[in-house]
């Protein structure tokens, strides 16, 4: 890495002795500058419509702050950005915003770009401005911020945001170089600017000097501009804060790396920037725009454009408002349209054919060339490379263009990068000297675009990967934090309950569950260890019996006072006998079911209990049968009143028989308590419920 102090030493040596160095390669094409630099810069009439592109610099477009239908003034801000790479654009005149839509761009592709279309009102009315006389009343930060807000970018061709360059160079600048070389043929806009606006240009340079605080300031101008050199030297008489250095005419001496090499003899390493060597470089047009912004309070809304070529009769340099259609400029300088010959934007070495003359003037537009048949010939057909090495000899960056050509054709991106394609400054020298008419610059630009696309895809993939990993880490962290919070809350609750009750509730609950399971296992296990399902069987039978009882229909029950017919009374008596008998049988069956379940405890007692149950059930059945006989005898009475009385007596006796059957179930349950109190209680309860329900049903039927 080159020491900035060495650069400063070489510049001071140049200042004292005038010593200059050179760089490898380069060419000396015909200049063709005299046809346009003989007249002062002039202004033209304004067009009816302006087409202001939202992107006119090396960076990104800002956010629109106007809408269709808004009335805007000259110099009013149309977009705003969030950082220095988002330069705002401003209205070139006063008028109405009639559209915001894609419009053909001043680019080789001609692809549409978002454009603000303004219809002029003819007043050309400025916004409110606040000019100042002395820039020393502002701080460096205030100047940088104003340079940004007023949309100033490098006007030498790269259009890099000036505020960004100034902020990056803070406290590192040793040498400030003002580039007035203007080495490309035909272009004379900087030449005329230095001649016609010398004082304002020097004021802009002093503003840069105030912000950057360099130790030396040098203005470099090619020696084919004697009038510009003389004008600046005359203005600098008696001043010692900067000096002018004339350099030999050679293309591309105006490129930043080559100009540094001429002035210092030091070559900037590949991949490094001039600021890393303590050097900051600005174009003369940029310095002039800074003066207009800081002193006059005017944003960048116009620039000097060279109009030249044999198809233009009134050649020269003009003030062109940004957004002016190029065809409007050409019509005012007597352009003779000819479809056989294209119009170029830029110089003959780095420029391109305009896809449409409706394209607007932007901050990059420094020259418009309209050639005739003496200046322009259709491109020769491309031939095979003969490996003559002319391109390598002429390359000012010491690259191997013929090798890069093969790599570009094969789309071997890795090899292209290994051979430093990124160091190519696209000056066009290699294509100029190629005897095979190979458009090398086109190949190199396409290869750079492809490499950039691959890198952007890789960058996006890496960013997506990082976002995914960050998301996973965040989710895992949130999960761990949530688990920790839940655990802490549970521990806190247990501690609080333990303090209030003296025991851990969770542990106590677990102990209760364990004790309950042990008790259940003890109850449901026989003496021999086999499982005891008798209780479940009893409950199942009881549920079945209850279901059968529920299915008995209780309809067609005649009121007691309606049984006046002897025949009906006889039928009722028969039904009563049947129901009583069925009740006795169910009671006998219940006793029989309960008896086997209790045999495990004491077989003898179970047998006695079963015998008693059967005896009592027979007695209840006999009583029910006797009751039915009495009812039948009584039904023989022909008197309806007596028949009704007999039926009522039959119902009462049937009800009494059902109650006795219920008592039998109770006694059986009581006797079985010796074997198993729990099972006996369950069986007795079920028996009572069933007997009572059956008695009620019989009473209703009678």
Curated annotation (Swiss-Prot):
Main localisation: membrane
InterPro entries, A to Z: 4Fe4S_Fe-S-bd, 4Fe4S_Fe_S_CS, Ion_transpt_RnfC/RsxC, Nuo51_FMN-bd, Nuo51_FMN-bd_sf, RnfC_N
GO biological process, one term: electron transport chain
List of residues binding [4Fe-4S] cluster 2: 395, 424, 427, 430
Subcellular location as annotated: Cell inner membrane
Domain of life: Bacteria
Keyword field contains Cell inner membrane: yes
Disulfide bonds: none
Cofactor binding note of this UniProt entry: Binds 2 [4Fe-4S] clusters per subunit.
UniProt-annotated binding residues for [4Fe-4S] cluster 1: 385, 388, 391, 434
Entry keyword annotation includes Transcription: no
Cofactor(s) named in the record: [4Fe-4S] cluster
E.C. number(s) listed in UniProt: 7.-.-.-
One Gene Ontology molecular-function label: metal ion binding
Record family assignment: Belongs to the 4Fe4S bacterial-type ferredoxin family. RnfC subfamily.
Subunit structure: The complex is composed of six subunits: RnfA, RnfB, RnfC, RnfD, RnfE and RnfG.
Name of this chain's protein: Ion-translocating oxidoreductase complex subunit C
Source species of the chain: Haemophilus ducreyi (strain 35000HP / ATCC 700724)
Phylogenetic lineage: Bacteria, Pseudomonadati, Pseudomonadota, Gammaproteobacteria, Pasteurellales
């Amino acid at each position: 890495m080159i020491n900035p102090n060495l650069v400063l030493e070489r510049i001071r040596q140049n200042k004292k002795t005038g010593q200059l160095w050179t760089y490898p390669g380069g060419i000396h094409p015909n200049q063709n500058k005299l046809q346009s630099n003989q007249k002062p810069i002039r202004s033209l009439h304004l067009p009816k419509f302006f087409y202001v592109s939202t992107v006119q610099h090396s960076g990104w477009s800002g956010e629109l702050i106007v809408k269709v239908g808004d009335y805007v003034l000259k110099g009013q801000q149309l977009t705003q950005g969030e950082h220095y790479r988002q330069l705002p654009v401003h209205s070139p005149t006063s008028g109405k915003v009639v559209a915001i839509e894609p419009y053909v761009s001043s680019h080789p592709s001609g692809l549409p770009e978002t454009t603000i279309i303004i219809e002029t009102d003819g007043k050309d009315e400025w916004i409110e401005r606040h000019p100042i006389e002395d820039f020393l009343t502002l701080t460096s930060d205030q100047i940088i911020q104003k340079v940004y807000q007023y949309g100033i970018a490098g006007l030498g061709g790269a259009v890099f945001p000036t505020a960004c360059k100034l902020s990056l160079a803070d406290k590192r600048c040793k040498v400030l170089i003002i580039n007035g070389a203007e080495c490309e043929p035909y272009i004379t806009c900087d030449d005329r600017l230095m001649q016609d606006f010398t004082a304002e240009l020097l004021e802009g340079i002093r503003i840069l000097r105030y912000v950057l605080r360099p130790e030396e300031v040098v203005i470099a101008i090619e020696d084919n501009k004697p009038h510009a050199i003389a004008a600046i030297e005359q203005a600098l008489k008696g001043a010692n804060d900067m000096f002018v250095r004339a350099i030999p005419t050679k293309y591309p001496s105006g490129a930043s790396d080559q100009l540094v090499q001429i002035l210092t003899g030091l070559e900037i390493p590949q991949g490094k920037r001039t600021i890393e060597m303590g050097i900051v470089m600005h174009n003369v047009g940029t310095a002039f725009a800074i003066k207009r912004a800081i002193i006059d309070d005017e944003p960048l809304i116009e620039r000097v454009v060279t109009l030249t070529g044999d198809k233009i009769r009134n050649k020269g340099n003009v003030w062109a408002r940004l957004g002016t259609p190029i065809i409007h400029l050409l019509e005012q300088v007597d352009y003779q349209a000819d479809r056989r010959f294209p119009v170029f934007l830029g110089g003959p070495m780095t420029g391109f054919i305009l896809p449409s003359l409706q394209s607007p003037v932007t901050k990059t537009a420094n020259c418009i060339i309209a050639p005739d048949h003496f200046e322009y010939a259709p491109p020769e057909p491309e031939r095979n490379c003969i490996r003559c090495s002319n391109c390598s000899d002429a390359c000012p960056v010491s690259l191997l263009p013929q090798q890069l050509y093969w790599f570009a054709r094969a789309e071997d991106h890795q090899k292209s990068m290994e051979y430093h394609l990124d160091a190519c400054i696209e000056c066009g020298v290699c294509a100029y000297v190629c005897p095979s008419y190979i458009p090398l610059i086109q190949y190199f630009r396409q290869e750079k675009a492809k490499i950039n696309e691959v890198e952007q895809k890789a960058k996006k993939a890496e960013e997506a990967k990082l976002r995914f990993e960050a998301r996973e880490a965040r989710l895992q962290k949130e999960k761990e934090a949530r688990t920790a919070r839940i655990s802490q809350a549970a521990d806190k609750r247990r501690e609080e309950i333990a303090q209030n009750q003296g025991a851990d509730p969770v542990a106590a609950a677990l102990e209760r569950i364990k004790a309950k399971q042990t008790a259940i296992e003890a109850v449901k296990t026989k003496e021999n260890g086999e499982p005891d399902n008798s209780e479940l069987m009893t409950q199942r039978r009881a549920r079945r019996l209850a279901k059968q009882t529920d299915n008995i229909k209780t309809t067609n029950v005649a009121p007691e006072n309606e049984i006046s017919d002897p025949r009906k009374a006889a039928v009722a008596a028969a039904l009563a006998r049947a129901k009583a008998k069925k009740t006795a049988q169910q009671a006998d069956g219940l006793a029989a079911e309960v008896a086997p379940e209790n045999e495990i405890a004491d077989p003898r007692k179970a047998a006695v209990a079963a015998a008693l149950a059967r005896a009592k059930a027979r007695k209840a059945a006999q009583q029910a049968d006797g009751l039915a006989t009495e009812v039948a005898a009584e039904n023989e009475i022909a008197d309806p009143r007596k028949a009704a009385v007999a039926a009522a007596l039959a119902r009462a006796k049937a009800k009494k028989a059902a109650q006795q059957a219920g008592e039998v179930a109770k006694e059986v349950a009581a006797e079985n308590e010796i074997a198993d109190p729990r099972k006996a209680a369950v069986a007795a309860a079920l028996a009572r419920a069933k007997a009572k329900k059956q008695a009620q049903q019989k009473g209703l039927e009678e």
